[in-house]
């Protein structure tokens, strides 16, 4: 699914975006953000982040730097310690 979504964005970049004036208010561009979000967070959350970003790309938003948030790693130690302190 990730490959299909990223492929769609790349088609947009190659066949649509390059022939239109640059209008993205952010860096990285919304399409580059979408690709990175999907690569980092997977198809579902990455698509959500990309759609949320695109919804902010309009003349009434100041734009600017807006990077994909890092993926939160599950902390096995904290889960383990929670179980150790749980009383039955």
From Swiss-Prot:
Disulfide bonds: none annotated. Its main location: membrane. It is found in: Cell membrane. It is a peripheral membrane protein. Could be involved in insertion of integral membrane proteins into the membrane. Residues 69-82 have a biased composition (Basic and acidic residues). GO terms for cellular component: plasma membrane. It comes from Listeria monocytogenes serotype 4b (strain CLIP80459). Signal peptide: none annotated. InterPro entries: Membr_insert_effic_factor_YidD. Belongs to the UPF0161 family. This is Putative membrane protein insertion efficiency factor. Keywords: Cell membrane, Membrane.
